């Protein structure tokens, strides 16, 4: 929106009063950093041979399909990306689903492991040997998960951490009520109730997520000199 408005003013001043072009120009200069951070326009270029490609994906149970097949769009996408390391969240599969996924991608990823306590369903697919799995324990009971793996890449050892942290957990009904509240179509009393409910959910989720982050950080501090890759669905956007 900032770019569009600023560009519009730039065109306007070019046509009607050229000397004022400096105003939107300064806007572009001052806003370059934030815009570049949130809208990273990258020029395609060839990658070095030593480049490592990583994919992190919350599959949502591979689309919540009752029966996963080779044609599953998420499986096909993962295969097409051909990443060196794949970290998946909510990747719980039946035994049949595991066989289907292995048939489709097992040749690409000879090293695989999972962490399936609760409903988190963390999975790692790797082209590098897995040396060791390190579960990360959260203090509060939860269905969320975090797990780490040590991989051997050439002569180096690297730590890969895969997380699925606490979400706010807003229901579809609450989302609809919140939209009405924002639009101003919800009654005053209902708006007050919904705002309190939302604040409570935000506070509760953030408190739980903070504890989970501490557990992940505690593990990372145990490997200060190890190359580390941190992936996951952090539910904090």
Language model: regions and residue ranges:
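Alpha-helix initiation/capping motif
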Residues: 1, 15-17, 61, 93, ...
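Transmembrane alpha-helices and immediately adjacent membrane-cytoplasm interface residues
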Residues: 2-45
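Structured beta-strand-rich core segments of catalytic domains in phosphoester-bond hydrolases
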Residues: 29-49, 66-67, 75-79, 84-181
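Short amphipathic alpha-helical segments, especially helix-boundary/capping motifs
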Residues: 49-52, 74-78, 189-194
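Active-site beta-strand/loop signature of hydrolases that rely on acidic residues for catalysis
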Residues: 53-59, 74-98, 159-164, 201-202, ...
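Acidic/histidine-rich helix-loop elements
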Residues: 56-71, 169-205
